[in-house]
Amino acid sequence: MKLFFYIFLIFAPFINSMERITISHAGEERSYLLFIPTVQKESYKLVIGLHGFSGSASGFEKETTGGFNLYAEEQGLIVVYPQGKYFYPSYQTTDPKGSPVTQTAYSSSWNHLGPLIANNKKVKMCADSSQSAPPFPSCKNQDSCYWTSCVDDSDFIKTIALKIQKEFSIGKSYVMGLSNGGMMAQLIGCQYPDIFDGVINVVGMQPHKLSCIPEKPISLIIYGGLLDKSVPPISINSSGGYFYEPIKNTVSEWSSKFNCKDTQNSKITTPFVSSETLFYNCDNDVTITAIINAKAGHAWPGITSNEGYCRSNIQSEIIYSECKEIKKISGSRYLLNRLFAN
């Protein structure tokens, strides 16, 4: 036992190490972080993890998910953490003496909105009194409800997935994300069901009346926190004035599309107090799962909602606070083990 402990201490720093990869996409430099487990396998599962609005690739791994690389090492997963486009918008505030001061803040996002509204531009995504976000430099003539960048993130993520699938022996591929990253993950599942085998959307309900449905079967876990006011799982109206599709509508449409024949409702008390609805015996043996955590808000299961707004040294060019180490992967086990089992 002591020998195992000493070996773990020797290799622990390498378990959490990642490589930063930069590629050219659509005339711009884009980057992602790559984690490869120490265990060698004939075939790996690939997981792509997408940070939330104003998050970072390294912040998603370190804080948002409670140190996802620990789970990836445990399961022998190859993980990619893409970085969303970001900029530093200015805003007005006051100094301690009450004098006006102009400051800047880091803002990042994934463009899930562009493809969703392409043929539905008349759908109203927010109330007139909504809290509008600073427009991204890549956006031209977008209305006040449009709060993401306007680059082709769908193709960027697809390009990464195909690149990794070519470079490594990949069995199955999955995409997951939190909030804006969850919205993007669901969109990727809708657009590329031939490339990905499953989606995990955490607190990322898509816009009301715009939530996408894939043309081909793909497994989905969609998770919401009952106390979430930012992107509520059961109500259309959010605290910020944006309109979101309730979880029950999304899973109803997906399960109907994939001809799911059976449904199972469960109450879970460990590791979280949650209600789960599982749709199974669907086309291609996919499963659709809705999870609502009764005691959680806008966060990854088991993690508080203020985590992930940071960066680690591997992304030192980002002007942001440095991430702390969080080692709490019960939420990742809770979600990923369910997806892998079905």
Q: Which ranges hold each PLM region?
A:
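Cell-envelope and extracellular/periplasmic
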Residues: 50-55, 162, 168-169, 178-180, ...
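A domain-start/cap signature at the N-terminus of enzymes
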Residues: 14-46, 54, 58-78, 149, ...
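Acidic glycine-/aspartate-rich tracts in secreted/extracellular proteins
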Residues: 39-40, 53-55, 85-88, 227-229, ...
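Alpha/beta-hydrolase-fold serine-hydrolase catalytic core, especially in secreted/extracellular enzymes
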Residues: 134, 139-141, 255-342
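The feature captures the conserved acid-bearing segment of alpha/beta-hydrolase catalytic domains
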Residues: 73, 197-285, 292-295
